[in-house]
Amino acid sequence: MSLGIPLSQLIVESPKPLSSGITGLDEILNLGFQARSIYEIFGPPGIGKTNFGIQLVCNSLEGIQQSEINDDKILWIETFQEMPINILRERFQKFKIVEENVKRVRITKFGQLLYFFQNLFKLSQSVRYKLVIIDGFSQLVCDHLCTLSKRGGGMIDKTIHELKCRHLILIFTVMTKYTHSTGSTIIVLNDCMNTAFQSNEFESLEEYYEILDDGSNFFVNSNNERRKNNVHILKSALVANIAMGSKDSTWEVFLRDRIGLFRDWNEQVDETVFVKSKRVKASSSQSNEGCTTIKEMRINKRNFENLRIAIVFNLHGEDRKREGRNLKRSRSSDDRNYIVKFDFDKATGQLRDIIDLKPDTANIASFPTLSTSSSSCSQVFNNIDSNDNPLPNAEGKEEIIYDSEG
């Protein structure tokens, strides 16, 4: 089978990038998802991978609506979860445009997917899909690897890893030929997996791992003593599976970018300062006359807001900032990964940007903080003079008697 791409297919005008609807992410991706490219989006269950794919479909349909003559179609490949078509019904009042331009197909085997793309490439002159989304691609790959491992009587990690790389190279080669012949964009939606999952002994997994009691079977702890000090990292299920190894770069070259979706917390500082007056009674004193009045200059109140983040992994070490037509190379991983904050807007049903509101902390550093590491109040407040005047705007003062021996 020929793996080459005719040069005439490359010397054409590039179509307009497909917007994700998240401004910060589009800026990193050079105005959006590029044509003739394959992207991987992975994340834990419930993070919104399918909703992200639906939003790409909606943005593509809106572009079709604006174009009077457009023969481009959208293909959604279902694996083990049906496409949420009801979201498109709510989004588009004229559902006819969805029925005419969005095609769905269900594939549950890795071999079926490979055969499907081989035939799709042969029919690329008659049927052209502008956008192809595969929801659950990693699950097809993992099931395929498990079947091969059981059929082979329990392959060693090196053998199954090399087999995984060869099969991914094969299917990504067919996908790449299709994207370059039609100018389409392929998005694969994958799960993520804990990197501690490395054993291929399916019958004895309980001896190595225990399920955390958090209501899900997602995070696990290692029971094996030699794995106790390992750091568990969430990675794409194409990488972290029973076929982990060091040669994943051989098939990652087919991906333009890898985007990880995770949850995070946005810290917001409330600048309201709470002032309290406290009287500390010495252990030798029997009355309140021996109490010393001190002022505590509170601790800033912090609120944590739940949100989502998208981490863009630049797999090929290319700097996003172009100098002319040349791409700059970067060896530092910190320079290659970009983080974008976003969340799901319930009002519009779309993913949106989050703008950080950073408070002015210029005066916060001048306030002394309260230390709780020592039981001696004289050591805690040794920098505060008891004869100072009360602070302005000291509303809601509170007097508390502390026994230094307590």
Curated annotation (Swiss-Prot):
The keyword rRNA-binding does not apply. Its main location: nucleus. Keywords: ATP-binding, DNA damage, DNA repair, Nucleotide-binding, Nucleus. One of its GO terms (cellular component) is Rad51C-XRCC3 complex. GO terms for biological process: DNA recombinase assembly; double-strand break repair; error-free postreplication DNA repair; heteroduplex formation; meiotic DNA recombinase assembly; positive regulation of single-strand break repair via homologous recombination; reciprocal meiotic recombination. InterPro entries: HR_Repair_Mediator (IPR052093), KaiC-like_dom (IPR014774), P-loop_NTPase (IPR027417), RecA_ATP-bd (IPR020588). Residues 385-406 are annotated as: Disordered. It is found in: Nucleus. Belongs to the RecA family. RAD55 subfamily. Present with 1050 molecules/cell in log phase SD medium. This is DNA repair protein RAD55. It comes from Saccharomyces cerevisiae (strain ATCC 204508 / S288c) (Baker's yeast).
